[in-house]
From Swiss-Prot:
The keyword Iron-sulfur applies. The gene is nadA. One of its GO terms (biological process) is 'de novo' NAD biosynthetic process from L-aspartate. This is Quinolinate synthase. Pathway: Cofactor biosynthesis; NAD(+) biosynthesis; quinolinate from iminoaspartate: step 1/1. Keywords: 4Fe-4S, Cytoplasm, Iron, Iron-sulfur, Metal-binding, Pyridine nucleotide biosynthesis, Transferase. It comes from the Bacteria. One of its GO terms (molecular function) is metal ion binding. Its EC number is 2.5.1.72. The lineage of its organism: Bacteria, Bacillati, Cyanobacteriota, Cyanophyceae, Nostocales. It is found in: Cytoplasm.
Length: 324
C-alpha cells in the first residue's frame, strides 16, 4: 500500500489576527527558530517575508543546509515533502495542506509502479514535482534547472523513463538527443498558455522577448528566445539588455522580476481562455494569514513513513551530488 504524506489536516485558527502580521510572523520565527522558504510562485507578501526564495532546486538545497528547528514551506505539498525527506528531525509546516500540484497528481503511485514494471531495464529519472511515493520509486530526481545536465551524465546505452512531466521530458530529449520513455503527465498552468495570443503579443510588442519555462508545450517554447527554470528566467531578465519580456510561466515570478529589474516591463503570457488560468490555484492557497496560523499553532505538519522517506532520499541525494 502506498502512503505519501501522513499529515495533520487540522489547522485550528483561534483568536484574532494581529494587526501587524509581518511583525507577528517575525516574532514567531525567533520563538520557533524557524525559517520560511518560499517558491517564486507565491503571493508577493509571502515572498517579501520569506528568508529564502527560490526554484525547486534552490529550495531543496536551502532545506538541506538550514540550521532552523522549524521549516515553514510556502509552496505546494511535494515541496514541503522534499524538505521533510531531507530533514526528518525537523518540524515541517505547510500553510495549507490542500496546496497540491496538478503535475504531481497526474502520476498516481499505483499506475506508475505498473508503468515502471513494464520497462524493467530502465533507469527512472523523476522531476521533483512528484509525490514522495514516486520519488521512492525513482533512481534520480531532477529539477527544470538540472534535468538536461543529469540526463547527459547517464550512459547513452542506459534506457531511461522520465516522469512525470511530458513537456519537460520532450524538452530534455531535444536538448540531449536521448530517446526517453515519457510518463504522460503535465502541469495545468503551463499547458494553458495560448500560442496564438503569444504570437499576437509579440506582434504588438516587437521589442519584447518571449521567455518560457520548459514545462510549457512545444508550440509555446518555439516562440521563446530563452527557455529555463524560474531561477534561470530571473537571471536572464536581469542580465539581458532587453527592456520588455513576455513571460510564459506562473505570473507569481513577476514580483521578483520587477524587484530585480525595476526598469523593465514584464507581460504575463495569456491563457487560452479569458480567465486567471495562468495562475496556479494551488500556490494561491497559501496566504500570509495561513502562514501566521501555521506557525502559531505548529500545524499542519508534514510527516511520512520512514521507509518511504529513506527510499525517496536516495534519488534526492543523487540529484544533489550530480548537480554540483
Amino acid at each position: 500500500m502506498f502512503t505519501t504524506a501522513l499529515a495533520q489536516r487540522e489547522n485550528t485558527q483561534l483568536g484574532e489576527l494581529p494587526l501587524d502580521l509581518f511583525a507577528a510572523i517575525q516574532s514567531l520565527k525567533k520563538e520557533l527558530n524557524a525559517v520560511i522558504l518560499a517558491h517564486y510562485y507565491q503571493e508577493p507578501d509571502i515572498q517579501d517575508i520569506a528568508d529564502f526564495i527560490g526554484d525547486s532546486l534552490q529550495l531543496a538545497r536551502a532545506a538541506e543546509k538550514t540550521n532552523a528547528d522549524v521549516i515553514v514551506f510556502a509552496g505546494v505539498h511535494f515541496m514541503a515533502e522534499t524538505a521533510k525527506i531531507l530533514n526528518p528531525d525537523k518540524l515541517v509546516l505547510l500553510p495549507d495542506l490542500n496546496a497540491g500540484c496538478s503535475l504531481a497528481d497526474s502520476c498516481p503511485p499505483e499506475a506508475f509502479a505498473a508503468f515502471k514494471a513494464a520497462h524493467p531495464d530502465h533507469l527512472v529519472v523523476s522531476y521533483i514535482n512528484c509525490s514522495a511515493d514516486i520519488k521512492a520509486m525513482s533512481d534520480i530526481i531532477c529539477t527544470s534547472s538540472n534535468a538536461v545536465k543529469i540526463v547527459q551524465q547517464i550512459p547513452k546505452e542506459q534506457p531511461i523513463i522520465f516522469a512525470p512531466d511530458r513537456n519537460l521530458g520532450r524538452y530534455v530529449m531535444e536538448q540531449t538527443g536521448r530517446d526517453l520513455v515519457l510518463w504522460q503527465g503535465s502541469c495545468v498552468v503551463h499547458e494553458t498558455f495560448s500560442e496564438k495570443k503569444i504570437v499576437q503579443l509579440k506582434i504588438a510588442h516587437p521589442e519584447a522577448e518571449a521567455i518560457a519555462h520548459p514545462e510549457c508545450e512545444s508550440s509555446v517554447l518555439r516562440h521563446a528566445s530563452f527557455i529555463g527554470s524560474t531561477a534561470a528566467l530571473l537571471k536572464y531578465c536581469q542580465n539581458s539588455p532587453t527592456k520588455e519580456f513576455i513571460v510564459a510561466t506562473e505570473p507569481g515570478i513577476i514580483h521578483q522580476m520587477q524587484k530585480l529589474a525595476p526598469d523593465k516591463h514584464f507581460i504575463p503570457a495569456p491563457p487560452m481562455n479569458n480567465c486567471a488560468c495562468n495562475e496556479c490555484p494551488f500556490m494561491r492557497l497559501n496566504t500570509l494569514e495561513k502562514l501566521y496560523w501555521a506557525m502559531k499553532n505548529r500545524t499542519p505538519e508534514i510527516t511520512m513513513l520512514e521507509d518511504i522517506r529513506l527510499a525517496a532520499l536516495r534519488p534526492m541525494q543523487r540529484m544533489l551530488e550530480m548537480s554540483v
